[in-house]
A protein has these predicted regions:
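N-terminal active-site segment of His-dependent metallophosphoesterases
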Residues: 1-72
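Short loop/turn motifs at secondary-structure junctions
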Residues: 3, 51, 192, 243, ...
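A conditional alpha-helix N-cap/helix-loop micro-motif detector
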Residues: 33-37, 71-72, 143, 177-178, ...
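Amphipathic, non-transmembrane alpha-helical secondary structure
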Residues: 37, 41-48, 76, 147-151, ...
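Residue-level signal for alpha-helix termini/capping positions
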Residues: 48-49, 80-84, 282
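Glycine-rich phosphate-binding loop signature in dinucleotide/nucleotide-binding domains
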Residues: 49-51, 156-159, 283-284
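His/Asp/Glu-rich metal-coordinating catalytic cores
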Residues: 54, 65-239, 243-244
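Accessory, non-catalytic peripheral segments of nucleic-acid enzymes
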Residues: 247-328
Length: 328
């Protein structure tokens, strides 16, 4: 196999509670309650669509150590589907779902699934074309620099094919994110890794291209806060002759948060404000939108894209806001 693809996702936060506005109306609660799980379904669809050799998930599969039963069953169902299509899955746990906290209803994983332990960096070979390295968090508050535990360039002879490092960490001191497993870029580029599949930071960012150091962002936005706005999804990585040839973002979110400028200074009543908001929705091509907050000439909104369901049809998703929720 001279060329192949893999998918890099992180921070699924399955069954995230969207604390703040879930109880404002039944429709709001339903839309938000299902958003993270439907984004997971879309991730599974993407892996099958692009014929991915494997999927890496860089931490925070669940939103908290309690790991709700609904989220666990949905996650396992997605992994079973990927296993059926021959897609390997490699998972690390992060600060929201550490291995030694919470509980698990899953006693046996589907074939082809590997969950990295927390005692040391493990290596998993993928059909002779790649070696994936990873380590999970044993507890939520990990302060060690885990990047230094990965193979260094001096040991370059180790591993086969493309070397992928999966790590949940704060690289470069991102503001607004706890300094868990904090490291700097030199710690990452000094390792014998060709592609760093990072998680923890919810804003999508490519820190380096040689080697690749990538945050895909979270799978589903959770609030109108800066790092949660805009398109959310995963990265599709194309590999040719043992080297990364392309890294492409694919949006998978079911609910999207944006902040838009809407001039309502001349509006005579609330009905006119709503009319202008609807007009803005149409201009953006969104299925539906809702106002979150407003100030002089400024209106924070969230939008639902016209999303592809698991059955392949095009159908809109209702979009409603949430508060900031839990920190990442």
């Amino acid at each position: 196999m001279s060329g192949f693809r893999f998918v890099h996702a992180a921070d699924l936060h399955l069954d995230t509670p969207f604390e703040g506005l879930r109880d404002t109306a039944p429709a709001v609660g339903r839309a938000l309650r299902d958003a993270s799980l439907e984004a997971l379904d879309a991730l599974v669809d993407l892996c099958i669509e692009v014929d991915a050799a494997f999927l890496v998930i860089a931490g925070d599969v669940y939103d908290g150590p309690e790991r709700g039963l609904r989220a666990q069953l949905r996650f396992r169902a997605g992994l079973e589907r990927l296993s059926h299509f021959g897609v390997r899955v490699l998972v690390v746990h992060g600060n929201h779902d550490p291995t030694e906290e919470g509980w698990s209803a899953i006693r046996e994983w589907p074939e082809g699934v590997h969950v990295f332990g927390s005692e040391r960096v493990e290596a998993v070979e993928i059909d002779g074309v790649a070696t994936v390295y990873g380590i999970s968090y044993p507890r939520s508050d990990v302060r060690e620099n885990l990047a230094l535990a990965f193979p260094r360039k001096a040991g370059r002879s180790e591993g086969t094919g493309l070397r992928v490092g999966v790590l949940h960490c704060n690289a470069g001191g991102h503001a607004g994110h706890a300094p868990y497993a904090a490291c700097n870029l030199d710690d990452l580029t000094g390792a014998a890794i060709d592609y760093w599949a990072l998680g923890h930071v919810h804003a999508r960012e490519v820190l380096c291209e040689d080697p690749w150091v990538v945050y895909p962002g979270n799978l589903q936005g959770r609030s109108p806060h800066a790092g949660e706005r805009g398109e959310k999804g995963a990265m599709v990585v194309d590999v040719e002759d043992g080297r990364v040839a392309a890294v492409t973002f694919r949006a998978l979110d079911r609910v999207r948060f944006l902040v838009s400028e809407l001039d309502v200074s001349s509006a005579s009543d609330l009905g006119e404000v709503e009319s202008r908001l609807r007009a803005q929705r149409v201009s953006r091509g969104a299925a539906r939108c809702a106002a979150i907050s407003a100030g002089p000439g400024r209106c924070a909104t969230c939008w639902s894209p016209c999303a592809r369901s698991r059955g392949g049809d095009r159908r809109p998703r209702t979009a409603f806001p949430s508060s900031g929720g839990r920190p990442s």
